[in-house]
């Protein structure tokens, strides 16, 4: 039977499953689609459909990611699931699949494991704002006290990484039992089967606990400048794609980065040779700026609402270093290494001042394939902020991907 198109009338939220290998992330993804399909809110996807995720490229890195979509009574969701641990690391750092929230899957039979910890840390570093927990494989735990113990362990772990461990919803269940119940009885309704109900309960928690994100157009205006040219008798035009917010003719904007911040007024906005009164997030526009000479503005600067972004030279970041097979370096690099950082629209030279491991110890050397916390310093100030993505390049090829976790100065 042909399915009608999803109506985009509900608020949209991006989520994903995270957690240790074999704890049931992909099985849960399949169980959510199977359960919501009972009410027509999804197309049921089998484990194999999700697991055979196609490769995609983001910032020069190949990542395997499966995307499914579904809806609850309140919302429309886009859900990402990655087959391998390395794919998660790359996905979260490149922001290839931006997550407004995550479902952390923990096996009730095993409790938190090393990748559970690593995914929570990564979520914190890359700015995944909210987590809901699914304690999977509950059917394998006979002792109620054991289940409570695992829940306590998960809450403590979340709190250790500055998530509100005491408040986060933790939903027990079994993804496999839910799928089997639906396979055995495809007309099962909510209230008929305890395992199916537990998947509904999880989605209720996701609906209630993960807030609807602010849309890009509701944020403050920012556009990275891609090109600059002069129009005789009219002034200087900066072109680029509006990253966020809305901008109107007559408004003041700041030109930030590279040199001292300048303020100017927008005298015109053009898109596809047509003049506009305002430009929105996602639009590729040319913005005419009053009293700015061609020499005062260049690619790599940003236009922004005054007072909303400042230029910085030093920052901490979470970085994934490409392997040789991914087209990265063949050899390690050390503190003091000076690559190019590709930030928004331009390459900036910077030097790496420190590498730090997850446990806080200082590391001297980084190998291809590593994920590391890195402090770096640009040779001139650039408009950066926490959560911003960048690539690390050497001679024009990408050798790493990173996300700013903290501004130093």
UniProtKB/Swiss-Prot annotation:
Residues 10-214 form the tr-type G domain. Residues 60-64 are annotated as: G2. Pfam families: GTP_EFTU, GTP_EFTU_D2, GTP_EFTU_D3. Disulfide bonds: none annotated. GTP binds at residues 19-26, 81-85, 136-139. Mg(2+) binds at residue 26. It catalyses: GTP + H2O = GDP + phosphate + H(+). One of its GO terms (cellular component) is chloroplast. One of its GO terms (molecular function) is GTPase activity. Residues 136-139 are annotated as: G4. It is an enzyme of class 3 (hydrolase). Residues 81-84 are annotated as: G3. Residues 19-26 are annotated as: G1. Keywords: Chloroplast, Elongation factor, GTP-binding, Hydrolase, Magnesium, Metal-binding, Nucleotide-binding, Plastid, Protein biosynthesis. Its EC number is 3.6.5.3. Residues 174-176 are annotated as: G5. It is found in: Plastid, Chloroplast. Its main location: plastid. PANTHER family: ELONGATION FACTOR TU, MITOCHONDRIAL, ELONGATION FACTOR TU-RELATED. GTP hydrolase that promotes the GTP-dependent binding of aminoacyl-tRNA to the A-site of ribosomes during protein biosynthesis. Belongs to the TRAFAC class translation factor GTPase superfamily. Classic translation factor GTPase family. EF-Tu/EF-1A subfamily. This is Elongation factor Tu, chloroplastic. It comes from Phaeodactylum tricornutum (strain CCAP 1055/1). The gene is tufA.
